[in-house]
Amino acid sequence: MKDYLVKALAFDGEVRAYSVRTTNTVSEAQRRHDTWRTASAALGRSLTAGTMMGAMLKGDQKLTIKVEGNGPIGPILVDAHANGDVRGYVTNPHVDFEGTEQGKLRVYQAVGTEGFVTVIKDIGMREPFIGQSPIVSGELGEDFTYYFAVSEQTPSSVGVGVLVNGDDSILAAGGFILQIMPGAQEETISFIEERLQKIPPVSTLIEQGLSPEELLYAVLGEDKVKVLETMDVQFNCTCSRERIESVLISLGKTELEQVREEEEETEVHCHFCNERYKFSKEDITNLIENL
């Protein structure tokens, strides 16, 4: 099954809902970054939340999420675009902890329970929108829920999950975001709160083969949900050799000549996708000649 996202309304417009399958997306991130189990879960949950938050934007708008906890994983960075493209990385991918007796990965130990979630939105204005909230649990779903309440004043519920196999490969990943619209009835809010208490973990529902639509039906009830739009989502980095060449050219002739003198081979590393671009002395000379 391919990865895709669903935008929906529920309860006659009282609730805005997003749901996504990100199994392939998180698998690609795990493959590129060689993340261990707990690191995969942390990165995967962040990529999943970022994908849905990106889908709230329009056109060529994009956002960056930075999760900076006090755990050994270090900062997590995610870039997400309105078109469904997402990329991201963890600073230390080789972090893993023994799971609980129920097999649940201890993501909070990797992320840490103190720190901040920062969201930077590039929505075409002169200055980007920057929102920040403290980490409340380190499990990430709760942390993004709190972010929406504090920074965007939108009562929300964020559920994100990643199931990781013993060989570090990704078995299932996905999630949902529910947002209560102004004027929603108390009965609606109470109904959703009760349903959220009863449903299994998100990753379990996805492992069972539930599509993004069926995930929303499981949470809200099929008769309550009106699907508005679906869109494909994927891990996709914006880096390229041409872009790296442009960055090198921007250094100027003097600095490029110094690079050519000091390095037999110049390597530029993209943290987001772990791609490495190599430039020989001859490559650098060609760049200098084009200045």
Curated annotation (Swiss-Prot):
Domain of life: Bacteria
Keyword Disulfide bond recorded: yes
Disulfide bonds: C237-C239, C270-C273
Any matching Pfam family: HSP33
One MF term in the entry's GO annotations: unfolded protein binding
Gene3D superfamilies in UniProt: Hsp33 domain, HSP33 redox switch-like
One of the protein's GO biological processes: protein refolding
Primary role: Redox regulated molecular chaperone. Protects both thermally unfolding and oxidatively damaged proteins from irreversible aggregation. Plays an important role in the bacterial defense system toward oxidative stress.
HAMAP family assigned: HslO
The family this protein is said to belong to: Belongs to the HSP33 family.
Protein name: 33 kDa chaperonin
